[in-house]
């Protein structure tokens, strides 16, 4: 009986720990505003400050947003997911919510007041959404609407993707399709002839290593903001070429 009680207590403690962790990672609703850009097909949202390039081919689609400076956090927020709902405006709001991925920066415009055109100026939290995403919660003619937002887990198909660009002694790895928190905080790389080496964030979710790794199979460790790490061992074969994409593990 004592053993069973101890097991139940341990299970309950683990559940409470996970609940606290989830609450810390994905907080309560907060207030912001949202606008839209990129056109009806979202073609104007391609590229962006996170480095994801063609958002169709990298799997992000049209449910994306550019974040204001305070949310973007120098690129550390790239890949994070947010649930947004239009906030209590019967004329301009639509019911329901939409989940978007952070793929770009909405730059500040200090020539305009924060509440009249300088929507993305610090310290305002603001989402400049891809037009198709905005139209799921707001009316086109509104232009800008008040929203409530919260961080939510990212849901992805398949594993984390590593696209190797650059050249010898300058390996630039784009990390995409990250589930869970989505926002990569650190990356390490290991060649078949080297130990683990930390990479530095070059820009967005492009991570840089200056080691010579040509001809080696490659492994990656990816850490996200909730403290978890995924290791993808030998995910890149020795015969890799620059420009190729490889799929590893997932959160």
Swiss-Prot record:
GO terms for cellular component: extracellular region; membrane. Residues 47-159 form the Expansin-like EG45 domain. Residues 1-24 form the signal peptide. Expressed in lateral root primordia, adventitious root primordia, coleoptiles, shoot apex, leaf primordia, panicles and flowers. Disulfide bonds join 50-78, 81-154, 86-93. It is a peripheral membrane protein. Keywords: Cell wall, Cell wall biogenesis/degradation, Disulfide bond, Membrane, Secreted, Signal. InterPro entries: Expan_Lol_pI, Expansin, Expansin/allergen_DPBB_dom, Expansin_CBD, Expansin_CBD_sf, RlpA-like_DPBB, RlpA-like_sf. GO terms for biological process: plant-type cell wall loosening. It is found in: Secreted, Cell wall; Membrane. Residues 169-248 form the Expansin-like CBD domain. May cause loosening and extension of plant cell walls by disrupting non-covalent bonding between cellulose microfibrils and matrix glucans. No enzymatic activity has been found. May be required for rapid internodal elongation in deepwater rice during submergence. Belongs to the expansin family. Expansin A subfamily. This is Expansin-A2. It comes from Oryza sativa subsp. japonica. The lineage of its organism: Eukaryota, Viridiplantae, Streptophyta, Embryophyta, Tracheophyta. The gene is EXPA2.
């Amino acid at each position: 009986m004592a053993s069973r009680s101890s097991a139940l207590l341990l299970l309950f403690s683990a559940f409470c720990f996970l609940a606290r962790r989830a609450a810390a990672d994905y907080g309560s609703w907060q207030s912001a505003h949202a606008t839209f850009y990129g056109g009806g097909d979202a073609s104007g949202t391609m590229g962006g400050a996170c480095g994801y390039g063609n958002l169709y081919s990298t799997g992000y689609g049209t449910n994306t947003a550019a974040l204001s400076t305070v949310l973007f956090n120098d690129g550390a927020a790239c890949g994070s997911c947010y649930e947004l709902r239009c906030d209590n405006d019967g004329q301009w709001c639509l019911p329901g919510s939409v989940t978007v991925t952070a793929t770009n920066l909405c730059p500040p415009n200090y020539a305009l007041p924060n509440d009249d055109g300088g929507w993305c100026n610090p310290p305002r939290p603001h989402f400049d959404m891809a037009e198709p995403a905005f139209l799921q919660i707001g009316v086109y003619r509104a232009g800008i609407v008040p929203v409530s937002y919260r961080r939510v887990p990212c849901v992805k198909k398949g594993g984390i993707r590593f696209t190797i660009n650059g050249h010898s002694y300058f390996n630039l790895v784009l990390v995409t399709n990250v589930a869970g928190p989505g926002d990569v905080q650190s990356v390490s790389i290991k060649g078949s002839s080297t130990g683990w080496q930390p990479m530095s964030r070059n820009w967005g979710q492009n991570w840089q290593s200056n080691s010579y790794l040509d001809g080696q199979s490659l492994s990656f460790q990816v850490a996200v903001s909730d403290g978890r790490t995924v290791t993808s061992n030998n995910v890149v074969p020795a015969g890799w070429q620059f420009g190729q994409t490889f799929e590893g593990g997932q959160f």
